[in-house]
Amino acid sequence: MQKKFPLNPGEALGMMGGGQLGRMFAIEAAYMGYHVTVLEPGELPPAAEVSLHHIARPYLSEEGLDALAADTAAVSTEFENVPAQALDRLAQNVFVAPPGSAVAVAQDRNREKHFIESVAHVPVAPHCRISAQSDIEAVEDSLFPAILKTARLGYDGKGQVLVDSRQDLARAFESLHGVDCILEKRLKLFKEVSVIVA
């Protein structure tokens, strides 16, 4: 759904997720004159403490999503693991940024790498997909030392294992229960940059 911009102070903004980032968003939005409604399954998440309304429903609850859309002029998400289909449903009735299609890419490290390389044409660390034990034998030796990362639901070091050899890789993949992964060559970092575009 299209929304005329800018949004005027006094309008309500929706936030999918009620953690610390949602809390910071709600505080800054209040300073700018906006009201925030948070949809978060938890009973008293950090963002709810500083928001006008808290909808305590699962992210895929039709009732919760419809209430959020009805109460707000625009909706965003505080993290990439909100179900993309929830954002797609919201977008039928309210402006949503980022869209569900972008979040779906950000939720999967393999899709994200492919997008960054082939669409954005930005160089990335050497990598390969590991989705089965048979993929381990095909890994080039030049990829080691590396980091094995779960393709989904990993953040802040969770779902990541340092590996120095094919044997380490096999053990690490097994320890991650054989879920879809990405193996990235370990590189020396000189700088890390985080960018948010509004």
Task: State the predicted function of each range.
Residues 1-107, 111-114:
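ATP-binding N-terminal substructure of ATP-dependent carboxylate-amine bond-forming enzymes
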Residues 107-194, 198:
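Active-site nucleotide/adenylate-binding loops and adjacent lid/helix of ATP-dependent enzymes
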